[in-house]
Amino acid sequence: LDYHYMDPVLLKASIIHDIFEDVKCVSPDEIISLDQDGKAVYDLVMEVTRRKDESKDEYLRRVLESGSQLAKILKCADRISNLTDLHTDTFDKGFIKKYIDETKKWVLPMAEEVNPNMHYELKDLIRRRESGLHFHRTIWPLTRTD
């Protein structure tokens, strides 16, 4: 919604995009039979779902190189949401660094392709998360000098 996308398939898929990774007892038929967009929603969700035989890099490469426009938009929006919640007080710094590197390598090019505003926001989030890593590494913990 932040980027004014009103495509019903994209919006529905954005709500359930992690369902097959997070919920083991959901069947494709449950998604497909929900409404007239069910098949298209299912197809989009599967397009942004990592396959069991894929490494994370293989998955992100697949979306970047052969994903549909909607899949790339959905992946970028998901990564923006995840980066927004990624802070050193709740996540390990090593995980944050790896996530940022992954975003630069795979998701930034997607955003550049599909939406300049998403690209700008991702670059800004990366900059802020990197500066947070640097800040915590060089300033904290504070030590008393008395």
Model-derived regions: residue spans:
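Active-site helical microenvironments for divalent-metal-assisted chemistry
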Residues: 1-146
